[in-house]
Amino acid sequence: PSNSSAASDVYKRQGYEVLQDPDGLNLRYYQIEAIQAAEKAIAEHKQTALLAMATGTGKTRTVLGMIYRFLDAGRFKRILYLVDRTSLGDQTMDTFKEVKLKELLTLNQMYDVKSLEDKEFEKDTRVHIATVQSLVKRIMYNESDKSLGVSDYDLIIVDEAHRGYILDKEMGDDEVLYRDQNDFRSKYRAVIDYFDAVKIALTATPALHTTEIFGKPVYSYDYRTAVIDGFLVDHDAPHI
C-alpha cells in the first residue's frame, strides 16, 4: 500500500510517549511491544496479525493505542473493531470516550467514532465498533437498508471472537444465528473473509480456528509472565 512507507515515517516521529503518559493511556511495556509487533507485521505487508495476551492484561487499552497510532499516522482511514458481545463493545466505547490521548483529547474527540447503537455510519466515520453477530445479520441475512461494501474498512481489529458462540449459548443471545459451534465458526470466518482489509486479532488463548485465520501469534504475553511481572495475581480471577 502507498501509505505504508509514509506511515512508517510518521511512526518514527510519533514515538510512544503519548501512549505511556501516566495521566492518559499509561500503557505497560508489553502493550507497547504488542503494538510494535502489529505495526511491524503490517510494514512487512502481512494481511493478518495475531496478538496473544492473557485475560486481564489490558487488551482494550492496547487496541486504543494501536488505533490512535494508525489514524494519526494516516496508515488506515477506516477501522472496524469487532467484539463478540455487546457488553464488551459498550466497555470499549467508554474507554474511547474517557482516556486522554494527544493534547488531552480522547479518541472520539479527535475522530468520528460510531458505537454499537449506530447501525449506519457516515463517510467520515473513522472507527466503527460492532459485534460479530450484527455483521452476520447484515452481511449474510441482509438485515439492513444499506449493504456493507467489501472495501468499506481498510483495517479490522477482532477481540476474542472465538468465545462468541459459547457466550451466546450461555446468554441465550442470538442463538438462532448459529446451529452449533462449527456453524458459528463458519459464519464468523465468512464475516472476516468478506472484507478486503488488513486484519489484526487479539486473543487470550489462540485456538486452532483462530490461528487458521490469523496465523501464529506475532506477539505473546501469557498469564505466567504477567504473574511474574506482578501485573496479575496468581490464581485470582483476573478482571476482563
Feature names for model-found ranges:
Residues 112-128:
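Conserved motor-coupling elements within RecA-like helicase/translocase cores
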Residues 102-107, 230:
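Conserved AMP-binding/adenylation subdomain of ANL enzymes
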Residues 167-237:
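Post-DEXD/H (motif II) to motif III coupling segment of the RecA-like Helicase ATP-binding lobe
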Residues 77, 126, 154, 197, ...:
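Conserved acidic residues
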Residues 5-78, 87, 91-103, 123-127, ...:
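ATP-dependent helicase/translocase motor core
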